[in-house]
């Protein structure tokens, strides 16, 4: 304390606070002009605004209010550093038309609605010294646009009308005096309740880090565009199924399909007694694997399949992979034991959302042997074709 030359601790605290304020305002004071003759206002992010203007910018208006993007930001110089100013923002119609989007372009569509009493937005830092306004860019990021008059300080605009933001600088702290009104043609936009031009939607997604909410259902259901869009703006997320052990694509075109050929309720149901068929030289039987993008339970035998071997109703018991189509003893006949195995793996499982019969004794789908000796279900597409030269017509399930 002695080094600061303060007589009391409170004096030292005041001196420290005043020095902080002085250093904070020094940057703005260097840009000041007490006469205000060199007052200048510059639009920040002008190239971005220009890019939106080239395709006719659109701004969303909602009942609860929606913030603008791009955000209106300006830089000011030439204010009196020691004078007090307030910054205000309103929106003025740019023409006498109502607009509509037809065949990829905006065209006039009749007379505009009567002008409403739009609220004037006062920057939350107002009033403040000129040095404060000049030290950094002034952002109107909290402005909300609405299409309903709710009296909450939001800016009410008519949908399908074109507007241009206007910034007003008012000197306060004495007799109020309007110092400057300024606007920028690059910031013109059409108020809409939903984006009409897909190019505008793409630009919003590309440059706005909070644009995930702008994605519509069509874009969410077309993942082929996801990698490109995600590389442009890292804020986008797509829902996808966990990666299967057989290497499913990250953004699969079958996102709405289940990962396994049967629902979990069927996967967990047990049946007994069973006869296990798998690839082996001892019984010369082959069971074809499912599609490599389906997730199957892990097992010591990758191609293991269980088929009920019973004349009556099935009873609970352990099973690796339950058979959903019980085979009755009277429904199977084998006429040609010398057939060859049909290795058409594409007919192993049904990939559509078809209802599956429950595994009970009251529902049975008979199997009928064809001339070639293969076994196939009646009515639906063939699920499994089995043939074995070691089996004879006298053998029954």
Swiss-Prot record:
Domain of life: Eukaryota
GO biological process: cell fate specification; heart morphogenesis; mesoderm formation; positive regulation of DNA-templated transcription; regulation of transcription by RNA polymerase II
DNA-binding region as annotated in the record: 48-216
Residue ranges of the region described as Disordered: 220-248
Keywords, ordered alphabetically: Developmental protein, DNA-binding, Nucleus, Transcription, Transcription regulation
Any one Gene Ontology molecular-function term assigned to this protein's record: DNA-binding transcription factor activity, RNA polymerase II-specific
Record-given protein name: T-box transcription factor TBX19
Lineage: Eukaryota, Metazoa, Chordata, Craniata, Vertebrata
Gene: TBX19
């Amino acid at each position: 304390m002695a080094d600061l030359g303060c007589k009391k601790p409170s004096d030292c605290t005041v001196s420290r606070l005043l020095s902080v304020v002085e250093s904070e305002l020094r940057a703005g004071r260097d840009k000041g002009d007490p006469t205000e003759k060199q007052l200048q206002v510059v639009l920040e992010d002008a190239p971005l605004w220009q890019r939106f203007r080239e395709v006719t910018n659109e701004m969303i208006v909602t009942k609860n209010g929606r913030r603008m993007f791009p955000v209106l930001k300006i830089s000011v110089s030439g204010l009196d550093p020691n004078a007090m100013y307030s910054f205000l923002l309103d929106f003025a119609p740019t023409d006498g038309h109502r607009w509509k989007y037809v065949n990829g372009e905006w065209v006039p569509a009749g007379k505009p609605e009567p002008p409403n009493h739009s609220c004037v937005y006062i920057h939350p830092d107002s009033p403040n010294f000129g040095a404060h306004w000049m030290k950094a860019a002034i952002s109107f990021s909290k402005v909300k646009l609405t299409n309903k008059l709710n009296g909450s300080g939001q800016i009410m605009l008519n949908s399908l009308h074109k507007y241009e933001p206007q910034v007003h600088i008012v000197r306060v702290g004495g007799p109020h005096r309007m110092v400057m009104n300024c606007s920028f043609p690059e910031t013109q936009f059409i108020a809409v309740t939903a984006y009409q031009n897909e190019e505008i939607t793409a630009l919003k997604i590309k440059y706005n880090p909070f644009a995930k909410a702008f994605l519509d259902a069509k874009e969410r259901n077309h993942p082929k565009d996801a990698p490109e869009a995600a590389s442009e703006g890292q804020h986008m997320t797509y829902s996808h199924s966990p990666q299967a052990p057989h290497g499913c694509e990250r953004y699969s075109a079958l996102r709405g399909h289940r990962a396994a050929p049967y629902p979990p309720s069927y996967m967990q149901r047990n049946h007994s007694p069973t006869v296990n068929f798998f690839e082996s030289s001892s019984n010369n039987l082959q069971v074809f694997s499912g599609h490599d993008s389906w997730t199957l339970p892990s097992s010591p035998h990758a191609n293991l399949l269980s088929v009920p071997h019973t004349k009556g109703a099935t009873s609970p018991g352990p099973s690796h992979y339950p058979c959903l189509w019980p085979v009755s003893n009277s429904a199977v006949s084998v006429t040609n034991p010398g057939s060859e195995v049909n290795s058409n793996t594409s007919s192993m499982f049904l990939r559509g959302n078809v209802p599956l019969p429950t595994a009970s004794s009251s529902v049975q789908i008979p199997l009928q042997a064809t001339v070639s000796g293969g076994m196939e279900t009646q009515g639906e597409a063939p699920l499994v074709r089995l043939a074995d030269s070691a089996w004879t017509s006298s053998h029954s399930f």
